[in-house]
């Protein structure tokens, strides 16, 4: 392996899959160990109506590409629609959350840079009964601060 990591192709239905924090499967496509710590990439399926609480990442930039479905984002206080095919970028320190507003699951590619957020997802998936308080407790040591409730509660449609 070089200092930069090794070239790799991760095909459809490949990668370690765990239960995501808002329900639905989360599949790692690239972890920090594979990318020399430069980024984490994962595919996530978001059930209808679901999404994380309002939060920010002090240490990570985050980006999404929406393969299927429709999400609604709250980005630094502004509500924005993200239909299928949308790309969303959120710089570190920006308050954000999202919600699947479609009647079917949404499928997204999520990237964090630098790598490290995979630790949050691994720890959350290991809980026997995940709850909203665990989201904040696990995220805080990783620089993720929960600021408010999910969009379904703060800004219902």
Predicted segments, located by residue:
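A short, N-terminal "cap"/entry segment at the start of jelly-roll beta-barrel domains
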Residues: 1-39, 126-157
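Short acidic-glycine-tyrosine-enriched beta hairpin
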Residues: 10-11, 70, 77-95
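Short strand-coil-strand connectors
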Residues: 22, 74-76
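Conserved hydrophobic/aromatic beta-strand scaffold that supports enzyme active sites
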Residues: 28, 41-45, 63, 79, ...
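Short histidine-centered beta-strand/loop micro-motifs
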Residues: 30-31, 53-58, 99-101
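Ligand-binding loop in jelly-roll beta-barrel domains
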Residues: 35, 72, 92-118
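Short, conserved beta-strand element in jelly-roll/cupin
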Residues: 41-47, 56-74, 111
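Hydrophobic small-molecule pocket/channel-lining residues, especially in calycin-type beta-barrels
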Residues: 50, 58, 71, 87-89, ...
